[in-house]
């Protein structure tokens, strides 16, 4: 999936905050 570039910053913050919590942390959501 893609996300609006205007939301990228928010997405980046969200990913940085939560991605490490998932199994195999650092996995990115597309």
Curated annotation (Swiss-Prot):
Signal peptide: none
Keyword terms: Antimicrobial, Fungicide
Name listed for the protein in its UniProt record: Antifungal protein
Tissue distribution: Expressed in the skin and the flesh but not the seed of the fruit.
Protein's job: Has antifungal activity against P.infestans.
An example Gene Ontology biological process: defense response to fungus
UniProt source species: Diospyros texana (Texas persimmon)
Domain of life: Eukaryota
């Amino acid at each position: 999936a893609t996300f609006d570039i205007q939301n990228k910053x928010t997405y980046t913050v969200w990913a940085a905050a939560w991605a490490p919590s998932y199994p195999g942390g650092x996995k990115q959501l597309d």
